[in-house]
From Swiss-Prot:
It is found in: Mitochondrion matrix. It comes from Emericella nidulans (strain FGSC A4 / ATCC 38163 / CBS 112.46 / NRRL 194 / M139). Pfam families: HSP70. This is Iron-sulfur cluster biogenesis chaperone, mitochondrial. PROSITE patterns: HSP70_1, HSP70_2, HSP70_3. Residues 566-637 form a coiled coil. It is an enzyme of class 3 (hydrolase). One of its GO terms (biological process) is iron-sulfur cluster assembly.
Amino acid sequence: MLSSRLSRALPRTAPFARAPAFRLPSTAARRWNSTEEKVKGQVIGIDLGTTNSAVAVMEGKTPKIIENAEGARTTPSVVAFAQDGERLVGIAAKRQAVVNPENTLFATKRLIGRKFTDAEVQRDIKEVPYKIVQHTNGDAWVEARGEKYSPAQIGGFVLGKMKETAENYLSKPVKNAVVTVPAYFNDSQRQATKDAGQIAGLNVLRVVNEPTAAALAYGLEKEADRVVAVYDLGGGTFDISVLEIQKGVFEVKSTNGDTHLGGEDFDISLVRHIVQQFKKESGLDLSNDRMAIQRIREAAEKAKIELSSSLQTEINLPFITADASGAKHINLKMTRAQLESLVEPLISRTVDPVRKALKDANLQSSEVQDIILVGGMTRMPKVTESVKSLFGREPAKSVNPDEAVAIGAAIQGAVLAGEVTDVLLLDVTPLSLGIETLGGVFTRLINRNTTIPTKKSQTFSTAADFQTAVEIKVFQGERELVKDNKLLGNFQLVGIPPAHRGVPQIEVTFDIDADSIVHVHAKDKSTNKDQSITIASGSGLSDAEIQSMVEDAEKYGAQDKERKAAIEAANRADSVLNDTEKALKEFEDRLDKAEAEQIREKINTLREFVAKNQSGEVAATAEELKQKTDELQTASLTLFDKMHKAQSEQQQQPNQGETGQGENKP
């Protein structure tokens, strides 16, 4: 029986073979960056947020946020599936959430790259109105209208909307993008985000940490050397990064955070409070009423936003439910102090990561010169106060919390395209990486906050006599035992010559690229047999599944275009109907009755067809609507042309008679 255990290489057979960490010094990094092959075509920057997303592009040397079709600078990261099968993304999806809560998917970024059994996922199951289900590979997926979707697929739909927004603005197809992720995302979550980009039809050139992108937006025009801290409290995640900005080099010194802490948690706290208050007053429990909870959730989010600028607000939800005594309403006054008391534990959870990030950067809080606030939750006065208390100074106000990340992504895109040449980004890996060794111990090869790209090797040996194969299990995390860390992947190295334990020399090499994606290689030094793995399916999606999702996204894209064309055709039909009816009413006494009746029949036929299409009784294509509209328009124009011609001839006849009489006068 083959043993699959590894142990550290024993000194009596060979000392540890520790290759030095490959870290690019500033000058070498500059050379590496400048010789990198430049990207052809426009590169957009996308902030794929938990609550809202944004897209930006560089226009010359100036980054610009692109407004969506509704004129907004951010788009809700919400996807819904209507009863007729239509897929809605963004504002349209959010608007119908109250009447369709089970099939409206929001905050799915919190599920990306996670297993169904994760504690965070189990908590979310109790808080969202839609179904979170377990996929066959153990990943957390979501369900809507009986169909199952991966969180990466939902993210792909949102990215597709951002792509469409950019293409409408630029008036040309867009393929290349830089997409941002929370700095504390692990490898699985990063790879799932890249999968989302692929599903959207994007070539994701780089995955950039959100705080780093915000620092790029902040420091692009700054001349002086600065040490900055980026405090990023968004809709679903919290990140803190400490950077040194020096002559165009943005070097991340440390990063920390919590991938399950954000505005959604603040909303949940407020929703629970409202439900408890209503139960106390009415005796009715709304916890299992999905439509009521969705209404309360929207009201809670609105109240939270209002209390950032007001000291008091009212939550009024009429007809929230009913019992034997009649309809029940929610009328609740909420003060800023009450809200702050409710969310104080959540704000406190950001303190420890900040202190750890400062410690890892070997800095005191007083040495940080600028504090940049990113994410919508940083607008809450209590959050700002907490940041001021931590750093002993007021945060900078020059960065838009909702837009900075997308702008930074666009800047990095311009760097990759060669349009911006004086900027270099040196990011870090947020979590330690290593393998399992004898006894379930987590042996680190790369420590957290190591500058990337990086490469490191270490030699191990067998843990049992005559062991001819080993299993390399790759983990990510900060705990001492592998059971407490995240398993990224595993592979077998076979064909090791039988020998006593501790004799074989197995070199394990970790290589992390600029996207923080991990590549692991193992080699038996005596035979040079090797095996490697790229942790490239952290989302749990196979290449076939991703390709299928790409095709689904393209299918939805085609359906969206068809629906848009059908809507435009229906609007044109309404316009032609109204114009024709108006003209018929105005000139009816001058028209041939039989011909006028034919036009009226065509009007009724088209109006009935349009009404059936709107009700869903028929699913008319744009071509069918166009054909029927053209028939009415052609018939009515022919009739009205005939009427105008006859009218013109009548007007000419008397004039000709008068002229003739005048000529016959003596």
